[in-house]
A protein has these predicted regions:
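Active-site beta-loop-alpha junctions of metal-dependent nucleic acid enzymes
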Residues: 175-179, 196-220
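Two-metal-ion RNase H-like nuclease active-site motif
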Residues: 166-176
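Short loop/turn microsegments at loop-to-beta-strand junctions
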Residues: 181-183
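Mobile genetic element proteins and their domesticated derivatives, centered on retroelements
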Residues: 13, 37, 81, 95, ...
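Basic, flexible linker segments flanking DNA-binding modules
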Residues: 55-59, 63, 106-161
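Acidic/histidine-rich, metal-coordinating catalytic segments
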Residues: 221-236, 254
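Charged alpha-helix within mobile-element recombinases
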Residues: 31, 75, 79-87, 241-248, ...
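Short, basic alpha-helical/linker "hinge" immediately adjacent to a nucleic-acid-recognition surface
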Residues: 1-89, 93, 97-98
């Protein structure tokens, strides 16, 4: 009987292949039959024969979700728009752009009308802003940071790292209830691809650095820069830079717009993990499901393609 592999098992397969170990040895290490490893590698390797554990796990998750949900296409366009709004939490503009790529025409204005016409308020609850908008003024203050040895200012970052080049990343932490739990978030700026993981040790700097290096290691050839804020949890940035052969740059204080990709991504995450949540009560599978959902959300900047599709196009 075929057993579903875990993320950890797929990562072990990836490392075993890198170390040129046999499939039999890898299978013995992770406790599965050799045929399971053989099938996994054959099924999820790219055209060049390279196996990427991250891609493999996302494909497996999507196959499981497709088999679990009803895939019947609604007869009416409004029903399909409603499904995408409620089921995927996409914005009206994302729904309109995505359906247009599929040859179905509906304006985002009409979808907003549908939301306003819904007396129950259910559709409104799936909009990120709940149909309420606030204008924020950007402020800038002088940066004086003394808690990060060897800090490299964002003003030293290459001009090419402006958000259009592939391989420039941003990172941040989302902190849970009582500052007792944290989730690390990483975002590739040009494609908005998200990687996130809960930190069992919270904001402990060494654990943060080790997790960043581990999560980005499979993509290390495409990690040209990393930009973050001045949180003390990132004080071991040299450890990250050494592991990935890159440079970590720090934004100015009170200038969150200097790392806008990760800030906007964190707001999307808050749709599923609201402020005041104790992350210790969330399963790793749930956190990964949030990552999957955000990465398959179409973006206007990508011509309504998805971060997942565009990221792996350039990777493969």
């Amino acid at each position: 009987m075929y057993n579903q592999l875990t993320r950890e098992q797929r990562y072990a397969i990836y490392l075993g292949i890198q170390e040129r170990r046999t499939q039999t040895a890898i299978a013995r290490q992770i406790g599965v039959h050799r045929s399971t490893v053989s099938r996994e590698v054959r099924r999820n390797s790219n055209r060049q024969g390279k196996y990427w554990w991250g891609i493999a796990h996302e494909r497996a998750q999507e196959r499981r979700e497709r088999s679990a949900r009803n895939r019947e296409t609604p007869a009416q366009v409004l029903r399909e728009a409603r499904r995408l709004l409620v089921g995927e939490d996409w914005s009206p503009k994302q729904i309109s752009g995505w359906l247009k790529r599929k040859g179905v025409a509906i304006s985002h204005e009409r979808i907003y009308e549908m939301i306003r016409e819904d007396g129950s308020g259910e559709l409104r609850s799936h909009c990120r802003h709940k149909m309420k908008y606030r204008r924020h003024r950007k402020r800038s203050r002088p940066t004086r940071v003394t808690n990060i040895p060897g800090r490299v200012s964002i003003h030293c970052r290459p001009a090419e790292a402006d958000g259009r080049r592939f391989g420039d990343w941003e990172m941040d932490l989302i902190v849970g209830k009582g500052q007792k739990s944290a989730i690390l978030t990483l975002c590739e700026r040009s494609r908005n691809y998200l990687i996130m993981e809960r930190l069992p040790q919270g904001r402990q700097p060494d654990a943060v650095a080790e997790t960043v290096a581990r999560l980005l290691w499979p993509y290390r050839r495409n990690v040209l820069t990393i930009t973050t804020d001045n949180g003390v949890e990132f004080c071991r940035h040299r450890k990250i830079a050494e592991a990935l052969k890159t440079t970590v740059y720090f934004a100015d204080s009170y200038a969150s717009w200097q790392k806008g990709a990760i800030e906007n991504t964190n707001k999307l995450i808050r749709q599923y993990i609201p402020k005041g949540t104790d992350f210790r009560e969330l399963s790793d599978d749930y956190i990964h499901s949030v990552q999957l959902k955000i990465n398959r959300r179409p973006r206007e900047k990508l011509n309504f393609s998805t971060p997942k599709d565009e990221f792996f196009k350039l990777l493969l």
